[in-house]
Amino acid sequence: PRKVYPVKGVTVKNNQISGYGNGIIMKLTNTAMVFDNQMKMKKPSVYSNIGIYAEDSRGTSIKKNTVSGTANTGIYFYDAAYSKNSQQKNYIQTNVVSLTGGDGIYLQRMSAASRIEKNTVKSVGGSGIHVKDGKMAGIYSNTVSSNKNHGIRIEYTTGGIWIRGNQVVSNKNCGIMLGKGKVSQVAGNTIYKNSKKGMYINGTDIWEVRDNTVTENGDAQEVYANNCKKLCSIRRPVCKKITTKSTDVAGTADGGYTVTVYAWISGKSQKLGTARVNTKKQFTVKIKKQKKNTVLKIVSKDRYGNAVSVNYTVK
C-alpha cells in the first residue's frame, strides 16, 4: 500500500570520512545509530557540504562523532511529515564539532523531541548550537566556545526548549540569543567572555530564566531583555572608588536585587558583605577595610538568581 516506509535499525560506526562531499546523510530513518565516526571534511568551491545530515528521521542517536572542516553545518537535523509528533526522541550527545563554515549543530523545524547534550562545539563559522522553527529540544551541559556568531541561538520555536548547565565562552556575538518564540527554561548556564552581550532575549515568551552566571562579556549590559514578562535587563554594577580607608562599597546595580562583595585573599574568595538594591538602583555594602591592590568581586543578582559581576581593585 502507498505510505512512508522508513529505513529501520541502521548503524553507522567507526568510519573515517574525508573529502569534499557530505559525510553521512540519512533520510526517513527510524532508530538509526551514528557512533564513533571521524569526519575531516574539505570545503568545496561550489558546493556547501555537511558533516551529518538527518532529514525526517525518528529516534536517531548521534554520539561520540568528530566533525570538522565542512563548508556548511556540522550536524544538521530537519523534520518534515514522517517525524511529525513522533514519540521517539533524537539524541545528539558527546560529539566534537569544530571549524565548520556554518553552525556547529543546527536543528530546523523539529517536531520530534531532541536532546543535545555534552557536546563540544568550537571555532565554527556560524552559531555553536542553533534551533529554529521547532519545539521540544533539551540543550544540556554542552561546551560552546570561540564561534563566529552566537554561542546558542534559539528562534521561532513553539515551546519545550530547555537550556541548562552549558558553558558558553568567547563567542564573537552574544553568548545565548533568544529571538521571537517560546522557551521553557534557561538555567544554570555559565556565560562569559563573549564579544557582545551575555544573554540577548528579545520578544521571547519564556517561562523561567534563573541561576545563570553572566560575566566578562563585551557589553556592560550583560543581560538584555526586551518585551519579556518577569525578566528585565541586567547591567554590571558600577561602584564608587574603593580605597584602603573604605568601609563600604557603594554604587548602582541596574536590574539587580542584591549585591554581594567578595575579596580574593591568599588565593581564596572571601565574602565581605551583601546588601539589597533600592528602588533608585543604588546599593551600599558594608565591608572591613582592605589592603591596597586587593581585588574585589562585585556580584549583582536579580530576583531569580541570575548573576553579573565586575572586579574592582582597592586603591
Residue ranges and their predicted role:
Residues K182, A187-K193, N202-R235:
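Acidic, glycine- and Ser/Thr-rich low-complexity intrinsically disordered tracts
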